[in-house]
Amino acid sequence: MNSKIFAVLFLLAFLSCVLSDQYCPKSSITACKKMNIRNDCCKDDDCTGGSWCCATPCGNFCKYPTDRPGGKRAAGGKSCKTGYVY
């Protein structure tokens, strides 16, 4: 009996971990003028309060993760600089 309860609890815990994936939110903006593109972050460490560095057409911004896919995390790298990229 105890092994059945353990198996059910284990399965529920496993499913909650699998189903709780987090993503950057999808941007509602599809295009941005080059002179308006700026990066507030280059990597997640640049963000505070559990937010992630997410890429948008207007640059990288700190956003809180969501459970809906569609957004894109910022790639960062040595060439990424904060501020206006124009």
Curated annotation (Swiss-Prot):
Localisation per UniProt entry: Secreted
GO molecular function: toxin activity
Entry comment on modification after translation: Contains 5 disulfide bonds.
Tissue: Expressed by the venom gland.
GO CC annotation: extracellular region
Signal peptide (residue range): 1-20
Disulfide bond annotation, renumbered to this chain: 24-54, 32-58, 41-53, 42-80, 47-62
Annotated WAP domain residues: 21-66
GO BP of this protein: defense response to bacterium
Keywords per UniProt: Antibiotic, Antimicrobial, Disulfide bond, Secreted, Signal, Toxin
SUPFAM superfamilies xref list: Elafin-like (SSF57256)
Function as written in the Swiss-Prot or TrEMBL entry: Has antibacterial activity.
Protein family according to the UniProt entry: Belongs to the venom protein 11 family. 01 (wap-1) subfamily.
Identification of the protein by name: U15-lycotoxin-Ls1d
Organism listed in the record: Lycosa singoriensis (Wolf spider)
